[in-house]
Amino acid sequence: MDRHFWFGKWIGDDQLSERLDALPGLMDSVLTAPFPFDSMLEAADKLADDLAQDTAIKKLLLDKALETTARQDAEQMLEATAAMLRKEAMLQKLRSELGVSHPGIPCRRYPHRQFEAWYPVGCVVHVMPSNVFAVAALGLIEGLLVGNINIVKLSVRDSTFAALFAESLCTRDISGRLQNYMAVIRTSSADQNRMQALFAQADAISAWGGERAISAVRASAAEGTRVIAWGHKISFNYVAAECLDDAELRNKALDGAAKDVCRLDQQACSSPQTLFVEGGQAEAESFARDLAERLGHISPGIPGQLPDEAEQAEITTVLNVANAEESLGLTRVFEDKHSKRWRVILDKRPGLKPSPLFRTIFVKAIQRQNIVKTLRPMRTWLQTCGLACGLKSLAELSRAFLSAGVTRITRAGEMVDSYLGAPHDGVYALTQLARRVSIDGPPAAEGIGTITQLEGCMESAPTETPILKKKEFQARATAVKQAHLMFQSGGSSGQTVFSTFSWDDYHDQMRAAGHGLVAAGLDPARDCVMNLFFSGHMYGSFISFWSILESLRVRQVPMGMIQDQAEITDKILLTGSNVLIGLPSHLVPLLESNRTQLAGRIKKIFYGGERMTRAQYRFLTESCNVSVVRSAVYGSNDAGPMGYQCPYCKGTVHHLMTDLQTLEIVDMEEDIPVSEGEVGRLIFTSRARQYPEVTRYEIGDTGRWIGGKCACGRLDPRFELSGRTGDAFKAGGPFFNYRKFVNLLDEGLEYTGPVQVHVREEGNTILLELWLAEGHAITAEAAERVLREQYAELEISKEAALAFKFQVCLVPFERFKRVTASGKIKPVCDHRTEIA
């Protein structure tokens, strides 16, 4: 019978030894390949969906769990397992424990040149406790999150739950590679040949159990192997003196302690076994009596399991001894006389005492000054303190407990509860399953932000999903409740819309954009950057680049897009800024007007928000001697950063940010991939956006793939931007919308003739010319006045002193430019020349 799930296949016990002998070859081939991280997250999230519904896999896993666990506990554990598998939960765990959302990627330690990363240890053998199915699933997921090869070792008595769980992840993995990282075997720890073969390939052994079991693992582990021990722990309640006399605090402490004693029948390491009362014996006895009364009310309402014969025998023995010692004045027993479900034992001797569990609690008096002396001898076994106290005692008591060896302090009544990303037994599990690595590359690597730029590992796009249009995306964004961060769109839709982000997603994307800025030529260790992007009105450019520059730890001068060129020039000279970032239509007039003062000062310009024309580029490089003029980032409020330039990217050519995005280029008319070199619509899928989800989003830009390898050495694919689709276009800063011009003329002047937009260059200035047809009882002046009054972006460009002009022209109807194929009037004609 097949009993082991061995890297995607079920095998019989007679095959296991042979497979163990072949492990070294498997390790060599798997560990050198990039881990399928995104596919793992998606597979886990799909399994979470299935476990949240009445599905066949949920029924199968529940049936297997019921072989060793009571139904209520099995259902609760399965529910907790499903919650753990959520993509959002796993990313939060990574961020909490490792500080990154994607381990295994060496990133620059800005402003320095070295790279660091959390990297998998390699092969992790998980030696799991018997009959605790959820622990095996948790251990497997934690190992996968870091990118390890995982072999879960269970006892022969365990069910096939963990193996079926692993198989379920594999069947939901679209990459087909996740199976190479998972095996679940059921074998006896007494089989030394197998255990030695298994441990010989382990880079780390994560072992659960008592002292004897952990010692056996350490003795069998190869020299230098990391042994991660998850041993038995002991926990307790503590009631501070101020909770004894205040009726409200006392009631809360009693309720909390009673719940802690009953929940899970004290089977968790975080369940209390002793309750300390701060004070003398009289206070302890009074609290014990009240606790017994409170248990009589609370215990019947909390379902539990009955002890087996051996466990009941231990309880009986402890009670018999306590009853005998009562005559000596050492103890007093308060017991459930009806159902025998709980018991409180007042013990007048000091010290933390283990309980026989199943709702059995010792109560002891203690003085605050004796906390450390009493508890520290047990420091290696201490875990949780369920603390009932007022605010005035919190700091002092917390310091005492933590000094004694406690690793976790909770509110009374919540000892077995936890939160996402919480440490376990004083450590983060993921740091135990990972290693911190560093790389100091050759001088050529100083322009590289992440090593993945040299690997070019773009994930496949989910082509079975329909393409997401702008209106649908905006509906998703509007549906997001309580977004952490909101930006106003630049206006490409012609309406006020918002883009929403979680803080985690935002910072991930800004860090990636920072890597792109370094690729473009920014030197975080030496440059000083003046941020001249527009701020206010909920626009994202200034604040986003503030965050980008902060992530690079580069010197920043946060000036903003102010109109006072003299002040900007003065601050450039005072601060020694040698790099400017902002809109071309703002930067070019600044250098035109102050060329003498700024001569030789500005070495680099990184632009964004609009196109850089050939004339502007030539002016900056030839007349102003700026040595580097490149795109700061290709991005949008909707999809975030999407592309970056390197020194070999000319014009609108960008490398794709594969850490964040996947890209498809589809036909202009049909949703099919374009032929090689053809221009099509850009379709982005974000790999780093939880809400709103960005899947196959038509961003509104057109472009084409650039074949071949880039001379910079990066393998991130390249694409060239060609223009915009639909009614939106950029000119002199903000987005403008053709349809909005038409609607304003219709509503304000009842103009019904044709409208055509022409965007031109006049030296370094952008001219937006709006053509209306002659003979419609309308003047150019009236039309321009209405549009300036009603279209705020026109005034923003004027107020910001951008190199931008707007004018309305009345022209003969026959002069309007038309689409050759259809004869239709072309809405937008862009006559600008871009950078060569």
Predicted regions: what is each one?
Residues 124-127, 151, 278, 383-387, ...:
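Short hydrophobic beta-strand segments
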Residues 122, 526-527, 603, 680:
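Nucleotide donor/acceptor-binding cores
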Residues 1-124, 438-488, 494-520, 524-526, ...:
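Nucleotide 5′-phosphate-binding alpha/beta core
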Residues 1-26, 30-33, 38, 197-457, ...:
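Active-site glycine/GP-rich loop and adjacent strand/helix microenvironment
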